[in-house]
């Protein structure tokens, strides 16, 4: 949610900032880095991956100037680990009462860069 303040400044939620940083990282790192998205939500959540996880995947695609729907890879549920691929793989974990955690990871095989966000309410 974006709010306009009396000082004409924009207050942006941190998940929107994560989306923006994901786009920048994807564009900056280029094709040598593979990416994946991991998310955790409460055990009652039915959909996977979450809308936010898909939004972050779109951020990766935008950064690469690629069609997101052609970049969607495998969608895992409750895996302890999951692979990188030429496409964007997603892993969704459902446990407890977790409000939401999202993590975008880029790997070149020699380096890993991770962006993450955790919500508490």
Predicted regions located by residue number:
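C-terminal substrate-binding/catalytic lobe of Rossmann-fold NAD(P)-dependent oxidoreductases
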Residues: 21, 30-121
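Rossmann-fold dehydrogenase core element
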Residues: 2-13, 27-35
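Donor/substrate-binding cores of folate-linked one-carbon enzymes
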Residues: 16-24
